Amino acid sequence: MEMAKKKAVALVAAFLALVMAFAAAGCGTKGTGKDGAAAKKNELLFATGGTAGTYYPLGGAIAKVWNSNIPGINVTVQSSGASVENLRLLDKGDADLALAMTNVADDAFKGKGQFSAPLKNFKAVGVVYPDVVQAIVAADSNIKTIQDLKGKKVAVGPTGSGTEVTTRIILAAYGLNYTERKDLQPVYATYADAVDQFKDGHLDSVWNVLAVPAAAIQDITTTKGIRFLSLEGPEYEKLLAENPLLVPYEIPAGTYKGQDKPVKTVAINSALYVRADLPEDLVYQLTKVLYEKKDEIAQGHDRGRQIDLQKALAGITTPVHPGAAKYYAEKGIKLP
């Protein structure tokens, strides 16, 4: 009887050992072994923006070029609320790579604006392209100046986006506050939703901070006449003086259908940021491909043509990742 019990125990132990061995082998093929761990580390999530904006399709073009030029990585693009949300995703480790406006990144690092505390788990790689503030109204609207937006229904950008942050700063410079005084009716719509609402006459104005020309605005002009609001007067000079990361920009006449005059506005650089703990060699490769394969990126999205190594650190105020810094050192570019 005792012998039978011992045999049963031995058989159970052997069976459990066999199950554990198979489990370990199975897990090893999915990432617990040396090769599996490396594969897991190279699965990268790239936070971008709304599907109707610039970040998402541009991010897709960049990811495609990374995947085809850097062995062993797989970058997956994810739509998001853009800059503010993207930096929070990096900080929490829920994304590995992200696009964000440099002014929003500056706020995040310092714990200002929409960030109640500093975010530290992200580092800069470099500037990708300039985003341009583009404020539109209907062609037959009686809104002629920024101040005329008082009491109007205005799409200010998605919650958690660089568009909303920048729009709020600009409107405040012209004496309009929609977060406390409710000087106007803000609509926190995605670009796609804002386009539809504007076409249907439910919005008085739409503010975009996008590359020029913006597909969202081009979409509107196919069915509706528009007019741009220029940034003018002493408020404009004060805006630039108090916000050094904003730079003067002029949208050339003829950029959009029915736009017969240049538009005076501002631009803000959009840059690539990564998790602070990404390996140096990986970020070096990502940086190298970003700036040396811009023509390939441009085949997927026209903004690729604006990627410029000589402007890679323009407006970058947050720490640069060591992997990117290594690449810049090789190219003779000094860190800010």
List the model feature ranges, each with a label.
Residues 28-47, 118, 142-153, 322, ...:
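Immediate post-signal peptide segment of exported/extracytoplasmic ligand-binding proteins
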Residues 128-132, 266-267:
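Short, solvent-exposed loop/turn segments at the edges of secondary structure
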Residues 1-43, 336:
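Short, low-complexity disordered leader/linker segments with a strong preference
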Residues 63-71, 91-95, 110, 172-176, ...:
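Sec-exported extracytoplasmic/periplasmic mature domains
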Residues 79-82, 86-97:
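Divalent cation-coordinating acidic motifs and surrounding scaffolds
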Residues 43-69, 73-77, 131-200, 314, ...:
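Bilobed "Venus flytrap"/periplasmic-binding protein-like clamshell domains
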Residues 102-104, 111-114, 120, 141, ...:
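Pocket-lining segment of extracytoplasmic ligand-binding domains
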Residues 257, 261-336:
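Segments of small-molecule ligand-sensing domains
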